[in-house]
Curated annotation (Swiss-Prot):
EC number: 4.1.99.17
Keywords: 4Fe-4S, Iron, Iron-sulfur, Lyase, Metal-binding, S-adenosyl-L-methionine, Thiamine biosynthesis, Zinc
Protein name: Phosphomethylpyrimidine synthase
Cofactor section: [4Fe-4S] cluster
Molecular function in Gene Ontology: 4 iron, 4 sulfur cluster binding; carbon-carbon lyase activity; zinc ion binding
Cofactor annotation comment: Binds 1 [4Fe-4S] cluster per subunit. The cluster is coordinated with 3 cysteines and an exchangeable S-adenosyl-L-methionine.
Annotated positions binding [4Fe-4S] cluster: C469, C472, C477
Protein function: Catalyzes the synthesis of the hydroxymethylpyrimidine phosphate (HMP-P) moiety of thiamine from aminoimidazole ribotide (AIR) in a radical S-adenosyl-L-methionine (SAM)-dependent reaction.
Native organism: Leptospira borgpetersenii serovar Hardjo-bovis (strain JB197)
GO biological process, one term: thiamine diphosphate biosynthetic process
GO annotations of cellular component type: cytosol
Pathway: Cofactor biosynthesis; thiamine diphosphate biosynthesis
Highest taxon above the source species: Bacteria
Region: Disordered, residue numbers: 492-511
Length: 511
């Protein structure tokens, strides 16, 4: 164990009117008391001393997998164990075998450590970032605040517009959650948008720049191989990954193998130096139901499994990105094959969307697939907003996407039987049956919306204790009628009579 330093982890305490307290996982952490306008002050650097100790002793590999394999329980692992209510040694073992990752760049001291793995709570990622069409630095920091307020466990900065470096710097200095990026976007900007002019040195320079700033994980599309590209020719929607299409264009322009694949060992060196984790990108993921589970998708997945082994040999953490658009009956095949080919490295999926017919509602079409794939063993879900396929999401879209995916993640935790997952459901159900409206609001994922919907028709304070809502009114509420029935049965001793009746019937039937 690195130290015996004591520390506290962020938890959100919900105090109920019956005196009960519920503590939930809290992603907002030290951002809770800050305003986006204060972004130039940053947030506390809670990992500063932990990192300094490792630098002072000359560590050359800053990956949590490196320490885990050496039998060391780091402060980050202890922190995660407290957040997840798990044993620190279990956390270490999961990281050591590659079944979980703890993304934590040595240059992101503001990070409040979290873990991604199938044996832990299902996590969600939110994407933010500017485009060539607009959005300021302050707006992007505000999106970060907004995403973690509603429960994003990690955030990816996908900026492609102006001031990319400065925008990313302030996102990192204000982020209590891991930040991921896709370096190929900025590399493309450096060669004036011409994919054929990309080369490994431009990419490595971009990688080093981002790692130096503190980015915790990189999406690297190293599995888009030259001989897989023809498999996409007859697809309905071709190659839908931006990174995948950029690298496919480079491969075809030069008729050479993907330079991210051929120079993978050089990329590993940068990851090792800063403790950055791989998020191996699915550049050939299906972009429509018709293309799901095809030869291109699964061919790339096999290569990602090979690259995972190469990264693990150097003690670098890896998670695998997944689809995409997949109908419900094909989802389990994705998980089973990923676990087999990638040796149970954490699976990180975009949805998947289970139908293509609902533009404007793809946060719903994808949350259905997300709940299913989470149940089957996926570790982290990348959210989809209502604007998917239509435009750049705004603040409200970010909220809608995060809430939809928090529902999917929690549903998966319930289905997997994660310890403690059902407690919040039980507390809310009890509050609902007892007509404790304020407690129902407080326990919901979005208290503001729950309260506003209730108050649209019954805004008066006295209605916060009423034994009905506007759906049924005072005379048709099933829960109120059930309470009256129970009271009547208790007064008349009906429970004892019922037990006697059941006993007599069993005797008559010879049971």
């Amino acid at each position: 164990m690195e130290s015996t330093q004591e520390f506290q982890v962020p938890l959100k305490t919900i105090r109920l009117t019956d005196g009960t307290e519920y503590q939930s996982y809290h992603t907002e952490g030290s951002l809770s008391d800050k305003k986006p306008s204060d972004y130039k002050n940053g947030i506390p650097k809670i990992r500063k001393e932990w990192i300094r100790t490792r630098l002072d002793r000359g560590d050359t590999n800053h990956s949590q997998m490196y320490y885990a394999k050496k039998g060391i329980i780091t402060e980050e692992m202890r922190y995660v164990a407290l957040r997840e209510n798990m044993n620190p040694e279990f956390v270490r073992l999961e990281i050591a075998c590659g079944r979980a990752i703890l993304p934590s760049n040595r240059n992101h001291p503001e990070l409040e450590p979290m873990i991604i793995g199938r044996n832990f709570l299902v996590k969600i990622n939110a994407n933010i970032g500017n485009s060539a069409l607009g959005s300021s630095i302050e707006e992007e920091v505000e999106k970060l605040h907004w995403a973690v307020k509603w429960g994003a466990d990690t955030v990816m900065d996908l900026s492609t517009g102006k001031n990319i470096h400065e925008t990313r710097e302030w996102i990192l200095r204000n982020s209590p959650v891991p930040i991921g990026t896709v370096p190929i976007y900025q590399a493309l900007e450096k060669v004036k948008g011409k994919a054929e002019n990309l080369n490994i040195q431009v990419f490595l320079d971009t990688l080093e720049e981002r790692a130096e700033q503190g980015v915790d994980y990189f999406t690297i599309h190293a599995g888009v191989l030259l001989h897989y590209i023809p498999f996409t020719a007859n697809r309905v929607t071709g190659i839908v990954s931006r990174g995948g299409s950029i690298l496919a264009k480079w491969c075809l322009a030069h008729h050479k193998e993907n330079f991210l694949y051929t120079h993978f060992d050089e990329i590993i060196k940068v990851m090792k130096k800063y403790g950055v984790s791989f998020s191996l990108g699915d550049g050939l993921r299906p972009g429509s139901i018709a293309d799901a589970n095809d030869k291109a998708q699964f061919g790339e997945l096999e290569t990602l499994g090979e690259l995972t082994k190469r990264a693990w040999e150097e003690d670098i953490q890896v998670m695998i990105e997944g689809p995409g658009h997949v109908p419900m009956h094909l989802i389990k095949e994705n998980v089973d094959l990923q676990m087999k080919l990638c040796q149970e490295a954490p699976f990180y999926t975009l949805g998947p969307l289970v139908t293509d017919i609902a533009p404007g509602y793809d946060h719903i079409t994808s949350a259905i697939g997300a709940a299913m794939i989470g149940w089957f063993g996926m570790a982290m879900l990348c959210y989809v907003t209502p604007k998917e396929h239509l435009g750049l999401p705004d603040k409200e879209d970010v909220k809608q996407g995060v809430i939809a995916y928090k529902i999917a993640a929690h549903a998966a935790d319930l289905a997997k039987g994660h310890p403690g997952a059902i407690k919040r459901d039980n507390l809310l159900s009890k509050a609902r049956f007892e007509f404790r409206w304020e407690d129902q609001f407080a326990l919901s994922l979005d208290p503001e919306t729950a309260k506003s919907f209730h108050d649209e028709t019954l805004p008066q304070d006295r209605m916060k204790t009423a034994h009905f809502c506007s759906m049924c009114g005072p005379h048709f509420c099933s829960m109120n009628l059930t309470q009256e029935l129970r009271k009547f049965a208790q007064e008349k001793g009906m429970e004892e009579k019922s037990e006697v009746t059941i006993c007599n019937r069993k005797k008559e039937s010879g049971k």
